[in-house]
Swiss-Prot record:
PANTHER family: UNDECAPRENYL-DIPHOSPHATASE
Name of this chain's protein: Undecaprenyl-diphosphatase
Enzyme Commission no: 3.6.1.27
Family: Belongs to the UppP family.
Broad EC category: hydrolase
Gene Ontology biological-process entries: cell wall organization; peptidoglycan biosynthetic process; regulation of cell shape; response to antibiotic
Length: 267
């Protein structure tokens, strides 16, 4: 892997991690079209660190408040809306953890293909369009109960299927439940913190036990590039989502999905 490849892959990861357009659909393109080799475990860990830093720093006030409220609820019986939201994020994280442990090998062997990614990119894009068109858009993230949190968590678990998009699935589920677009995005981004942490930790443990060589320059390129691109992406997505809706992302997903199919059929 060259520094140029490291920069492009980290840029793709940072820009697509928090948009409802599927990072896996984009990360398959360089290898499918340009023949780039797999970037390796160390680089995967690096871009996870970069995107995690971006969302934690962007939502730093909310993260601190939610952590304080969570511990206050455990040790002091705090029942504030912040404590409730913190617990809803915990509940929403559980399905992905269970699904990941049970289905990880099946997904890796049978579902990580370009045809699956193209199909899910299209199907979940159409689902996002339908939900956004018919949603009530009235609730905020603090109105989340355990049933809603579990429903969104199941959507996050299904997003482990390549091409689905974690943010796309969770935002779609939240919109279906009546969240405003901005609230759906905020809840999705806050939900990403524990799941990216767990995924990065798992990859980190695999890296340690694999003995794979680590190139510090590539790692720093991955961390810095994914951090900057993800931070900018979060900022502008939240600023623009209420007025532009999900249609631009739906159109983009359809173009990407059908374009990937066309490439595969011609290859």
């Amino acid at each position: 892997m060259s520094y140029f490849e490291a920069f492009i892959l980290a840029l793709i990861q940072g820009l697509t991690e928090f948009l409802p357009i599927s990072s896996s659909a984009h990360l398959i393109l360089p290898s499918a079209i340009l023949g780039w080799e797999d970037q390796g475990l160390a680089f995967d860990v690096a871009v996870h660190v970069g995107t995690l830093m971006a969302v934690v720093i962007y939502f730093r006030q909310e993260v601190i408040t939610l952590f304080q409220a969570l511990f206050a609820s455990i040790f002091k019986g705090d029942r504030s809306k912040e404590a409730k939201l913190a617990w809803m994020i915990v509940i929403a994280t559980i399905p992905a953890c269970v699904f990941g442990l049970l289905m990880k090998d099946i997904i890796e062997v049978y579902l990580r293909s370009a045809y699956v990614i193209a199909t899910t990119t299209i199907i979940f894009g159409l689902l996002l369009w339908w939900v956004d068109r018919n949603a009530e858009l009235v609730a905020d993230e603090y109105q989340t109960g355990w049933k809603k949190a579990l429903f969104i968590g199941i959507a996050q678990a299904l997003a482990m299927i390549p091409g689905t998009s974690r943010s796309g699935a969770t935002i779609t589920a939240a919109l279906y439940l009546g969240f405003t677009r901005e609230a759906a995005a905020r809840f999705s981004f806050l939900m990403s913190i524990p799941i990216i942490t767990l995924a990065g930790g798992y990859l980190g443990m695999k890296l340690v036990t694999s003995g794979e060589p680590v190139h510090i320059g590539f790692l720093l390129t991955g961390i810095v590039t994914s951090f900057i691109s993800a931070y900018i992406c979060i900022h502008f997505f939240l600023k623009m989502i209420s007025r532009m809706g999900m249609t631009p992302f739906v159109i983009y997903r359809l173009i990407l999905g059908f374009g990937l199919f066309a490439f595969l059929l011609m290859a």
